């Protein structure tokens, strides 16, 4: 279990999870606001 926790704290794993979450967030924003160069509700 100690080696598994060491693996999960590795930088490549954390950066992959972070970039995956960021990509999912951008995809969802583009799904609700397609091609929004300006946001008209400001």
Swiss-Prot record:
Compartment list: Plastid membrane
Record keywords: Membrane, Photosynthesis, Photosystem I, Plastid, Transmembrane, Transmembrane helix
InterPro entries associated with the record: PSI_PsaJ, PSI_PsaJ_sf
Recorded superkingdom: Eukaryota
Similarity comment: family membership: Belongs to the PsaJ family.
Function text: May help in the organization of the PsaE and PsaF subunits.
HAMAP family, A to Z: PSI_PsaJ
Protein name in the entry: Photosystem I reaction center subunit IX
Species annotation: Cuscuta reflexa
């Amino acid at each position: 279990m100690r080696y598994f926790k060491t693996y999960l704290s590795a930088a490549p794993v954390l950066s992959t999870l972070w970039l995956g979450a960021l990509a999912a967030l951008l995809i969802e924003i583009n799904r609700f606001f397609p091609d929004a160069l300006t946001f008209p509700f400001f």
